[in-house]
């Protein structure tokens, strides 16, 4: 494992354990057996380090989705599977508290805002593809695919976030009910 990967691994665990604000660069340096010079050489700022971790997690998520979606024959099936996968893999859940702290404190700056929007758009884009292909295949007729994609992404994120303490089987049942109601509203 190279030094950059070690720093990323240690930082991720600290962000999960302590949250964003309570994690210090000093702790990251100490536990990664690195130096502040190395940390700043690779990431420039704590914010950039955190964003790099989120990018890595997003890439892992997208790779998993690519492998899973080939099981689906229809876009309806893709919608159900994407939502269930969001729930069962818990998307970013271990980092959720750190993300909320980071989001509320740093989202105001233009560069961070741009990077966070880019991450969010990757998630929304998956819905966009599902809905657009469903339109083309006659599974539904959506006039504003962009808006419907954003609505679906935010609704699913809410279900994932606010049902976390519930039994996984109940959560899956709830997510499938959401998917059914949502898609029934879109059906021709």
Swiss-Prot record:
High-level lineage: Bacteria, Bacillati, Bacillota, Bacilli, Bacillales
Domain HTH tetR-type, first and last residues per copy: 1-61
A GO molecular function held by the record: DNA binding
Job description of the protein: Transcriptional repressor of qacA. Binds to IR1, an unusually long 28 bp operator, which is located downstream from the qacA promoter and overlaps its transcription start site. QacR is induced from its IR1 site by binding to one of many structurally dissimilar cationic lipophilic compounds, which are also substrates of QacA.
DNA-binding region: 24-43
Annotated source species: Staphylococcus aureus (strain Mu50 / ATCC 700699)
Protein name per UniProt: HTH-type transcriptional regulator QacR
Key words of the record: DNA-binding, Plasmid, Repressor, Transcription, Transcription regulation
Known partners and oligomeric status: Homodimer. Binds cooperatively to DNA as a pair of dimers.
SUPFAM superfamilies on file: Homeodomain-like, Tetracyclin repressor-like, C-terminal domain
